[in-house]
Curated annotation (Swiss-Prot):
This is Protein EPIDERMAL PATTERNING FACTOR 2. Induction: Induced by high CO(2). Keywords: Developmental protein, Disulfide bond, Secreted, Signal. The gene is EPF2. InterPro entries: EPFL. It comes from Arabidopsis thaliana (Mouse-ear cress).
C-alpha cells in the first residue's frame, strides 16, 4: 500500500513540476501600445523585431526571442475596465532640489484614477 502511495505522490509531483516549467517558459511578445504616443512606440517595436530577424538570418543559428529589459512606460489599455478613454497620467511630488523626485503613473478615465497594472 505504501509503495502505491509513494508512486502516486511521485507522479503527482512530477506532473506539477512539468506544468510549472511549461507555464514559466511561455512568454508573450510585448504588446503594441496605442495610448499617448503609441505610434512611435509601435514603430520602435517593429524596428527592433525586424532587426532581430536580420540577426537570425545572418547568424543562421537558433532563433531566440528578445524582450526589452529595464523600465518602460505603463500600458493603461485594460486598467480602467469598461471606462474609456483610459489615459496614462504622470503624478509627481514636490521635493527639495537636492533629492530626486519620484514619478508615479496612474491611469485615468472620466476623472477617476485607476491603479497601473504591473507587468509580471
Amino acid at each position: 500500500m505504501t509503495k502505491f502511495v509513494r508512486k502516486y505522490m511521485f507522479c503527482l509531483v512530477l506532473v506539477f513540476a512539468a506544468c510549472s516549467l511549461v507555464v514559466n517558459s511561455i512568454r508573450t511578445p510585448p504588446l503594441k501600445n496605442t495610448v499617448n504616443g503609441g505610434e512611435k512606440k509601435n514603430a520602435d517595436i517593429e524596428q527592433a523585431q525586424t532587426h532581430h530577424k536580420k540577426e537570425i538570418s545572418k547568424n543562421g543559428g537558433v532563433e531566440m526571442e528578445m524582450y526589452p529589459t529595464g523600465s518602460s512606460l505603463p500600458d493603461c489599455s485594460y486598467a480602467c475596465g469598461a471606462c474609456s478613454p483610459c489615459k496614462r497620467v504622470m503624478i509627481s511630488f514636490e521635493c527639495s532640489v537636492a533629492e530626486s523626485c519620484s514619478v508615479i503613473y496612474r491611469c485615468t478615465c472620466r476623472g477617476r484614477y485607476y491603479h497601473v497594472p504591473s507587468r509580471a
